[in-house]
């Protein structure tokens, strides 16, 4: 087992323990997303010094929450979520990863805009907007599928 896989396995076990301790409040911390981010950080840590630093940070983040999970302050929660977003931002900017479904959402909005334009041209928003939205969803879904196949999703 590689060092990175071992790190992820240990972190996953700690997160599962934390989920059990937090109970229903666990969803407020997006721990599922946290594990997806951790898996990708583990994959890039061998080649990226920032990812190696983030591994230590992620260990500390879970350790801090595990001390007294029922007495977590709003500041601790805000810090946890802020750090997770910082790490996610690094993965997106430095390693070119995208969130699953990101392109679909973006192109849905673009398609709606194009649909409004088509509705004006054809003098019928009933035709233009749904057509634009449909094209946007299809185009975004295709790009998301390509990203998934290329292993570029988080």
Q: Where do the protein language model's features map onto the residues?
A:
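Generic, low-specificity signal for short hydrophobic/alpha-helical stretches with a mild N-terminal bias
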Residues: 12, 16-19, 23, 43, ...
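N-terminal leader/propeptide segments of preproteins
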Residues: 1-48
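Membrane-proximal, non-transmembrane alpha-helical segments
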Residues: 57-109, 117, 121
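Short, well-ordered alpha-helical segments
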Residues: 49-57
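N-proximal short alpha-helices
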Residues: 7, 27, 31-34, 86, ...
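Short, charged juxtamembrane terminal tails flanking transmembrane helices
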Residues: 149-154
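Small-residue-enriched transmembrane alpha-helices
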Residues: 103-120, 124, 128, 132-144
């Amino acid at each position: 087992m590689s060092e990175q896989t071992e790190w992820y396995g240990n972190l996953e076990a700690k997160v599962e323990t934390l989920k059990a301790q937090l109970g229903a409040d666990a969803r407020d911390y997006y721990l599922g997303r946290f594990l997806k981010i951790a898996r990708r950080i583990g994959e890039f840590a061998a080649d990226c010094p920032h990812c190696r630093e983030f591994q230590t940070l992620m260990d500390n983040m879970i350790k801090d929450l595990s001390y007294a999970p029922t007495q977590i302050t709003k500041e601790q929660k805000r810090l946890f979520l802020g750090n997770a977003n910082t790490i996610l931002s690094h993965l997106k900017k430095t390693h070119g990863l995208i969130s699953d479904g990101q392109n679909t959402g973006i192109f849905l909005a673009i398609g709606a805009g194009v649909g409004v334009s088509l509705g004006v041209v054809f003098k019928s928003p009933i035709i233009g907007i749904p057509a634009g939205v449909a094209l946007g969803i299809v185009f975004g879904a295709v790009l998301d599928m390509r990203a998934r196949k290329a292993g570029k999703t988080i």
